[in-house]
Design a protein with these regions (language model features):
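Short alpha-helical transmembrane segments in multi-pass integral membrane proteins
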Residues: 1-15, 69-135, 177-231, 288-355, ...
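Transmembrane helix-bundle signature of multi-pass secondary active exporters and lipid flippases
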Residues: 14-63, 67, 130-137, 224-290, ...
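Helix-loop interface residues and adjacent transmembrane-helix termini in multi-pass membrane transporters
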Residues: 26, 35-38, 72, 149-150, ...
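Structural signal for membrane-spanning alpha-helices in multi-pass inner-membrane proteins
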Residues: 29, 102, 145, 171, ...
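Membrane-helix interface/capping residues of multi-pass secondary transporters
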Residues: 29, 38-41, 153, 182, ...
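Small-residue-rich hydrophobic transmembrane alpha-helices
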Residues: 41-96, 100, 137-156, 262-326, ...
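Hydrophobic transmembrane alpha-helices of multi-pass small-molecule transporters
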Residues: 53-56, 167-171, 197-201, 271-275, ...
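Short runs within selected transmembrane alpha-helices of multi-pass transporters and secretion channels
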Residues: 62, 129-148, 156-167, 185-198, ...
């Protein structure tokens, strides 16, 4: 199949899959807003960074290990099988602290994220349940990434969408007919990755399957090799958590719980937007890694250009939709009809989403750098985007401009990162893919 056709096949299927993942959090927020109003939206926004931290670990292990596997497979190196087994084992070990936190200190974790007494009391059942299921969130990321890299992106997409559909349907069933409230929302979210893993497991029964689970002890060396290439995925997910945490504390000081609830609306739609651009980067990754493994540097560069053009078009479509539907989108999560919350969220949506004109390119470029075994540049880009630039811009701009400065921090930080990323790409363009 032509490389361009392969690109759009992998990317489109991966976008749909990741959209499903983000939409189940969107569904959680919608149903929780109906049950608990702005306090419920505030609670979920305080929990979002915890989700991000769990997904960040899973993403780093999954994408890094799957990239190592894809490169080894392209070079006919049988040792690539060990990356799959090691990824599963390390993810289970990495999830243990989250499970312990869910079992014993969910309230302390919510207080650490900025929750007051009322929010903590409301959120303990929700946080406890989803933290206890942390291994399934991480392993779902891993199984999906490896199935995609083993030539079955369609099954990975179907599995992710099926898990997300289960979450949306059972959010409603558990919360309303069964009356389980926020605990029901957490239970539906927690079970959805199990559904996805079960469907992805069909790949192992196919004759085209080349993945095998090798009996071995967890290897710190293999994990370190994988994490070098997975750091962009880690920081990409973690950046959402860092951004949400910093913004939450700034907005609590500027506008209280109503400000955090308004940001909750923005953050939930931002998850959907980020999923679209992650879909482009992660969809292109197996193809870029294959080109790199076969020394097809021209093919790898072509995929970078295709990806960059795709994210720019998607950013324009996304912003047009957000700008035209701002009031409608905000109203979905404003069951109490709070005028102040609606005003904050309206301004926030229109300012914040300008940043995706730059964020899409940054996500694509970081994924490309990892896929062609340039972990240092990928790490620099990702850390600038996810840590340094966003924290600096949010602190400085909020101090000068108040709430508008908080909303402007995301576009400003993504612009600065895009300039750095362009420099890194051009600096070694003649020497590497």
């Amino acid at each position: 199949m032509d490389l361009t056709k392969q690109f759009f096949k992998y990317v489109s299927q991966n976008i749909f899959g990741l959209l499903g993942t983000s939409c189940y959090i969107l569904a959680d927020t919608y149903f929780i807003a109906q049950v608990a109003g702005t306090d419920g939206v505030t609670l979920l926004n305080l929990c979002l960074p915890i989700y991000n931290f769990i997904f960040a670990i899973g993403s780093m292990i999954a994408l890094g290990s799957a990239t190592r596997y894809a490169i080894a497979k392209a070079q006919n190196d049988a040792r690539g099988q060990r990356y799959f087994s090691n990824a599963i084992l390390c993810a289970v070990l990495a999830s243990i602290p989250w499970m312990l936190a869910g079992a014993f200190v969910p309230g302390a974790l919510l207080r650490l994220m900025g929750g007051d007494a009322g929010i903590v009391t409301l959120g303990i059942p929700y946080a406890r349940i989803f933290l206890l299921f942390a291994p399934f969130f991480m392993c779902n990321y891993i199984v999906s990434a490896f199935v995609r890299n083993d030539g079955d992106p369609s099954l990975a997409m179907v599995a992710t969408l099926s898990g997300s559909l289960f979450n949306v349907v059972f959010d409603y069933v558990f919360m309303f007919p069964l009356g389980l409230g926020l605990a029901g929302a957490a239970l539906a979210t927690a079970v959805s990755p199990i559904i996805s893993i079960a469907i992805c497991s069909r790949h192992f029964l196919k004759k085209e399957n080349t993945l095998q689970f090798v009996r071995q002890m967890p290897s710190a060396r293999l994990l370190a090799q994988s994490c070098q290439l997975g750091i962009s995925g880690f920081v990409g997910e973690l950046s959402s958590g860092v951004t949400t945490t910093v913004f939450n504390f700034l907005l609590l000081g500027l506008a209280g719980n109503v400000g955090v609830a308004a940001y909750g609306v923005v953050a939930n739609f931002a998850l959907v937007a980020t999923a679209i651009f992650n879909g482009v980067a992660q969809g292109a990754q197996p193809l870029v890694s294959r080109c790199y493994g076969q020394n097809d540097h021209a093919g790898a560069r072509k995929l970078l250009l295709l990806g960059s053009g795709t994210v720019l078009v998607l950013a324009a479509v996304l912003y047009a939709a957000v700008f035209g539907l701002t009031d409608t989108l905000v109203s979905w999560f404003n069951s109490e009809n709070s005028v102040q919350m609606a005003q904050y969220a309206h301004t926030g949506m229109r300012m914040y989403f300008v940043g995706y004109f730059f964020a899409g390119f940054n996500i694509m470029a970081a994924g490309y750098l990892s896929a062609v075994n340039r972990p240092v540049e990928a790490s620099v880009t990702s850390i600038c985007r996810g840590m340094v630039a966003i924290v600096t811009c949010s602190l400085v701009l909020s101090a000068v401009f108040g709430m508008p400065g908080v909303w402007a921090a995301f576009p400003a930080s993504e612009l600065l990162t895009a300039l750095l990323t362009l420099f890194l790409l051009r600096r070694k363009e003649s020497g590497k893919a």
